[in-house]
Regions:
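Short, conserved phosphate/pyrophosphate- and ester-handling motifs at nucleotide-, phospho-/glycolipid
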Residues: 38, 157, 279
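Hydrophobic beta-strand signal
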Residues: 42-44, 129, 303
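Rossmann-like S-adenosyl-L-methionine
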Residues: 2-8, 17, 211-446
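Terminal RNA-binding accessory module
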Residues: 1-74, 349-350, 357
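Short, acidic/hydrophobic/Gly-rich beta-strand patch recurrent on exposed beta strands
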Residues: 21-26, 139-142, 207, 336
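Short, aliphatic-rich beta-strand segments
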Residues: 194, 200-209, 267-271
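Short, solvent-exposed loop/turn elements at beta->coil junctions and helix N-caps
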Residues: 114-121, 182-183, 189-191, 426-429
Length: 446
C-alpha cells in the first residue's frame, strides 16, 4: 500500500470518471491529478484511503503525446474544466471510455458505445451561472468546494455572459451591495444567471437573498449597457439556506421574463427555471440520436418523462401519433404547452408532477406507450420509476443521461425488469469538462 507524502514512479493506465489519471502502486489504485494515459511519472501521494489513494504529478519522465499547454489562465484554480491539459482526441477517448466502462462494470451490459459525437469546444454554453461571494466577488467555484475564484473570462461561456458578469461587478463596487454569505446566511447577491439564444439575445436573472436590491434601476441599466441584446432582466428571490440556485418567486425588473430560441426547427419559449440543454448544437445531435433510437414510424404513443420545456417531446411528436410529457416544474410545463401551441403541434399532452407519481398513475390506468423516453437529472431514476415504466410494457425505452454511473445503475435495474440495452452512443455536450451525455436504447428481452 502506498504511503502518504512518499513519491513513487508509476505509469498512468487510464482515467477516472472525473478525468484523473489512474496508476497502480503497490497493488493499489492511485488517482493522479492532471496525469495522462501512458505517461511515466513520479507521483506524490497526498491521501490514502482503504481501497485507493490520491496523488499529484511531480515529474514527468515520459510525457503523453496527448498533453498540451492549458489555454486558460484559471485552469487548475477554477473547477469548471477538467481536460484543458489534454488534446481533443484524448478527451473524446476518455469520455467514450467512461460511458463504455460504466455500462459494462456497473450495468452488467455488453452493449458497445457505437459513437461519440462532438462539436465546437469553445464558447458553447448558452446558460451561465456565476456565484457571488460574501466579499462581492463574481466568478466560479474551485473544484469540489464553494471557494470562489474570480474568473474574468471563460472559454466555455458566450461573450454576453462575461459582459454581464463585468456589469454586476461594477454594480457591486459602485453601490457596495453585499454578497451572500453561506455561513451566516446574510447578504443579498447570490448568483448571476444569463441565458443566450442562437440569435444572440439574452435573458438575465439576478438571484438574491431577499425581496429587492438597492438601486435596481441602476443595476438594470448597467446590465443592458453591457449586453445590448438583452430582452429582459428578472429578479429571482431565493431565501432558502441551501445550495440551490433557482427557486422561489421571480419579478421582472425590465422587459420580458422569457427568452425564445430555435432548436431542431422548432421554437421554444424559455422561462428562467425551464430546463434546456446548455449546448445548442450538440443538443440537436442529442435529440436526433434519441429520435433515431426511438425508431418511430408515425403511429406510436410516446411517454416523455422529465420533459422540461417539451423539447424532446415535440421533436418526437413530429414522428409519432401521440406524445405525453411529464415534468415536476410548473413553469416548465407552462412553457411546454405554449411551445406546442406556437409550433402548431397538436398531438402532445403535458402533465405536471413528480415522475414517480406520474409514471405510477399512468401504469395503474393501463397506459401502454410504444416508447418511453426518460431524461432525468444527474441522480437518475428511482426504482419506482423503473418499475412503473416496465409495467407499462413499452416496446422500447430511450434513456438520455448526463451521468454514466447512474445510467448504468438504471440499465441494470431495467434488466431485472426484462429490458436490455441494445444501442448506446455518447454526445460531448460539455467540451473541456468531464461531463458527458449519453443515449441508450433498451428493448424487451422477455
Amino acid at each position: 500500500m502506498p504511503e502518504k507524502n512518499r513519491t513513487y514512479r508509476a505509469r498512468i493506465e487510464g482515467y477516472t470518471s472525473e478525468g484523473l489519471g489512474v496508476a497502480r502502486i503497490d497493488g493499489q489504485a492511485v488517482f493522479v491529478h492532471r496525469a495522462l494515459r501512458g505517461e511515466d511519472c513520479d507521483v506524490l501521494i497526498l491521501k490514502v484511503l482503504k481501497n485507493a489513494a490520491f496523488g499529484k504529478v511531480v515529474q514527468v519522465h515520459e510525457p503523453s503525446p496527448y498533453r498540451r499547454e492549458p489555454d486558460c489562465p484559471w485552469y487548475g484554480r477554477c473547477g469548471g474544466c477538467d481536460f484543458r491539459h489534454m488534446d481533443r482526441e484524448e478527451e473524446l477517448y476518455a469520455k467514450r471510455q467512461r460511458v463504455q466502462d460504466a455500462l459494462h462494470r456497473i450495468g452488467g451490459s455488453d452493449v458497445s458505445v457505437e459513437a461519440i459525437y462532438s462539436g465546437e469546444p469553445l464558447h458553447y454554453r448558452n446558460k451561465s451561472q456565476y456565484p457571488v461571494s460574501a466579499d462581492g466577488q463574481v466568478g466560479f467555484y474551485k473544484a469540489r468546494s464553494h471557494q470562489l475564484v474570480p474568473v474574468e473570462r471563460c472559454l466555455l461561456q458566450k461573450p454576453p455572459a462575461d459582459a454581464a458578469a463585468d456589469a454586476l461587478r461594477r454594480y457591486i463596487e459602485t453601490y457596495r451591495v453585499p454578497g451572500y454569505d453561506e455561513k451566516t446566511r446574510r447578504g443579498l447577491l447570490r448568483h448571476l444567471y444569463i441565458r443566450t439564444n442562437q440569435a444572440g439575445q439574452s435573458l438575465i436573472c439576478v438571484l438574491v437573498n431577499g425581496k429587492k436590491l438597492p438601486h435596481e434601476p441602476e443595476m438594470v441599466s448597467l446590465l443592458r449597457q453591457a449586453v445590448p441584446e438583452t430582452v429582459g432582466v428578472v429578479l429571482g428571490v431565493n431565501t432558502q439556506p441551501t445550495g440551490a440556485i433557482l427557486g422561489g418567486e421571480y419579478r421582472t425588473l425590465w422587459g420580458e421574463d422569457v427568452l425564445t430560441d430555435r432548436l431542431c426547427g422548432l421554437t421554444f419559449r424559455l422561462s428562467v427555471p425551464s430546463f434546456y440543454q446548455v449546448n445548442h448544437d450538440m443538443a440537436e445531435v442529442l435529440y436526433r440520436t434519441a429520435l433515431d433510437f426511438a425508431g418511430l414510424t408515425g403511429t406510436e404513443t410516446v411517454l416523455d418523462l422529465y420533459c422540461g420545456a417539451g423539447t424532446i417531446t415535440q421533436v418526437m411528436a413530429r414522428r409519432a401519433g401521440r406524445v405525453i410529457g411529464a415534468e415536476i416544474v410548473p413553469a416548465a410545463i407552462e412553457d411546454a404547452r405554449e411551445n406546442a401551441r406556437r409550433n402548431g403541434i397538436g398531438n402532445v399532452e403535458f402533465f405536471c408532477g413528480d415522475a414517480s407519481a406520474v409514471a405510477a398513475d399512468f401504469a395503474a390506468r393501463g397506459l401502454r406507450p410504444d416508447v418511453i423516453c426518460v431524461d432525468p437529472p444527474r441522480k437518475g431514476l428511482s426504482p419506482d420509476v423503473v418499475s412503473a415504466a416496465a409495467r407499462m410494457q413499452p416496446q422500447r425505452i430511450v434513456y438520455v443521461s448526463c451521468d454514466p454511473a447512474t445510467l448504468a445503475r438504471d440499465v441494470k435495474l431495467f434488466a431485472q425488469e426484462g429490458y436490455g440495452a441494445v444501442r448506446a452512443a455518447a454526445v460531448d455536450m460539455f467540451p473541456g469538462t468531464a461531463n458527458i451525455e449519453s443515449v441508450v436504447r433498451l428493448e424487451r428481452t422477455k
